[in-house]
Amino acid sequence: MDLLFLGTSAGVPTKARNVSATAVIETNGSHWYLVDCGEGTQHRLLHTPLSIRDLRAIFITHVHGDHCFGLPGLLASAGMSGRTQPLELILPVALHDWVRQGLVASDTFLPFELRLLAVEELAEWRNEALQVTTVQLSHRVPSVGFVFTELNPEPRLDTQRLQAEGIPRGPLWGELAKGLTVQHDGQLLDGHDYLRPSRPPRRVIVCGDNDNPELLADVAKGADVLVHEATFTQAVVERTGVTFGHSTAAAVARFAEGAGVRNLVLTHFSARYQSDPRRSPNIDNVRDEALAHYSGQLTLAQDLQRYHLGRDGCLEPVG
């Protein structure tokens, strides 16, 4: 899986960062999934190779506007781009009427079926490539993290099973390797039944706003990547005395170290943290605080940067 960050700022955009939106991209092909959709997300997409037509589902972590105000525009543009395949939108039930009424009030026609699913009732979402589950977080409003787990990654033909069942090597094997259904000796064989993963599935957790990383203790075990907010540094919280339901870089880093998280990606940075290291406070303060508590692979997400999770389990920037 790849991650492409479309927005990494908390609350409001800055000149360098837009508000929250993260693309999770399938290992093979161009299909992708969107976690959160802050205002301006569709404009950020124009600077990436991602197509709205290839978007398979949208997941919204909570109701705050910096995570969802981009939805109406994105949906309208999806319709104008010629999308016709159904789109599933998993979001808090409190936003369902807001989405519907916004489309109606603006006389927006969607040439595709929009399926609204309540995140509060989501036990599991899946297709042939991924399984998605939720973990409850702690914020001023209900918030969740989404756990993306690959299904049957990089499938290879189970030749031992084929030989054991007496299915001769030849064109049938080629069809089954594509996942197609074929006929053999009067029986229909589903290609998916003869495919097995060639490596362990990868698991990526993309979190909404959260002031208690320990809530991730169970799902973080064995996860390949944890994407978590680091809105503040400890120094700022000690000076202001408030967190507004958010985490510090230190708190997230301590948790990730204790949980054995191999790749930690911090995002959702307060607009006060400048990109220029000569300014104070700056984004290097966030990095330094996290590195003081975490010894794994640390990444501070950047807008429009794509990251690839390699076979060696390391998350690296692309390009």
UniProtKB/Swiss-Prot annotation:
The keyword tRNA processing applies. CDD domains: RNaseZ_ZiPD-like_MBL-fold. Zn(2+) 2 binds at D66, H67, D209, H268. It is an enzyme of class 3 (hydrolase). Zn(2+) 1 binds at H62, H64, H139, D209. Its EC number is 3.1.26.11. Keywords: Endonuclease, Hydrolase, Metal-binding, Nuclease, tRNA processing, Zinc. Its cofactor is Zn(2+). SUPFAM superfamilies: Metallo-hydrolase/oxidoreductase. The active site is at D66. Zinc phosphodiesterase, which displays some tRNA 3'-processing endonuclease activity. Probably involved in tRNA maturation, by removing a 3'-trailer from precursor tRNA. Belongs to the RNase Z family. This is Ribonuclease Z. It comes from Pseudomonas putida (strain GB-1). The gene is rnz.
